[in-house]
Amino acid sequence: MENIKNPKNADDCSDSISKNSHQGVDDSLNQSRSYVCSFCIRGFSNAQALGGHMNIHRRDRAKLRQKLMEDNKDDVVAESDASEVVSLDLNEQQQQQGEALTCDDHDQYVDNDISPKQKLEFWVQESKLDTNDHGKVTEASIDGSSSSHHRDIEVLDLELRLGQSVVKKKTT
C-alpha cells in the first residue's frame, strides 16, 4: 500500500484511498471463496452468512417440495390405473391398429394377416407369510401355487446391556 503524505487536496486523498481499498478487495477475492445461494443465486463472502440466508428459503423449499410430491403422486396414480391390466389381447389391438392405418393412409400397405390368438399375461411374484400355531412360518404364493417353507421364528432380544456380552441360549 502507498503511504500518502500531505495530499494537495481532499479529492486526491479519497481517490488514492479508494484505489488502495479496491486493490485489497481484488486481492482478497482471488484468495477467498465465494458462496452462492442455489435458490436465488445471491453471493456471500462466507459459509455462515450463506447458511443464515438459506434459512429464509426454508419455507419456499418446503412449498416447492410439497408441490413436486403432489405432482409425482398424480403421475403415480395415473400409472397405477394403467398398470391394472392383467392381460392384453394382442389380436384385438393389432386389428384396431390395422383398421386405423388402412382408413387413414390409403397409399400404405398394411398386413392384416394376424396369427392365431396371442395373449400376453403379466405375472406377479408376491408372497405372503403366515404363522401357524406351532411357531412356523408358511409362505403362501398369491398366484395359487402352494410352496411352503418352514422356518423357526427367532425372538429378538432388544434389551440394552453394558459391558461384555453374555449369550444365553434358550432350550426348547
UniProtKB/Swiss-Prot annotation:
Keyword Protein biosynthesis attributed: no
Superkingdom in the source lineage: Eukaryota
Biased composition (Polar residues): 15-28
Alphabetic keyword roster: Activator, DNA-binding, Metal-binding, Nucleus, Transcription, Transcription regulation, Zinc, Zinc-finger
Lineage start: Eukaryota, Viridiplantae, Streptophyta, Embryophyta, Tracheophyta
Phenotype on disruption: Altered response to auxin, but persistance of the telomerase activity.
Entry remark concerning the domains of this protein: Contains a slightly degenerated ERF-associated amphiphilic repression (EAR) motif, which may be involved in the activity of transcriptional repression.
GO biological process, one term: regulation of DNA-templated transcription
Subcellular location: Nucleus
Zinc finger extent (C2H2-type): 35-57
Annotated organism of origin: Arabidopsis thaliana (Mouse-ear cress)
Expressing tissues: Preferentially expressed in roots and flowers. Slightly expressed in leaves and stems.
Gene3D superfamilies for the chain: Classic Zinc Finger (3.30.160.60)
One of the record's GO cellular component terms: nucleus
Cited InterPro entries: Plant_dev_regulator, Znf_C2H2_sf, Znf_C2H2_type
Name used for this protein in its record: Transcriptional regulator TAC1
Location (main, coarse): nucleus
Region described as Disordered: 1-28
Annotated gene: TAC1
MF annotations from Gene Ontology: DNA binding; DNA-binding transcription factor activity; zinc ion binding
Motif, EAR-like (transcriptional repression): chain positions: 156-160
Role summary: Activation factor which mediates telomerase activity and potentiates responses to auxin through the regulation of BT2. Binds in vitro to the DNA sequence 5'-GACAGTGTTAC-3' of the BT2 promoter.
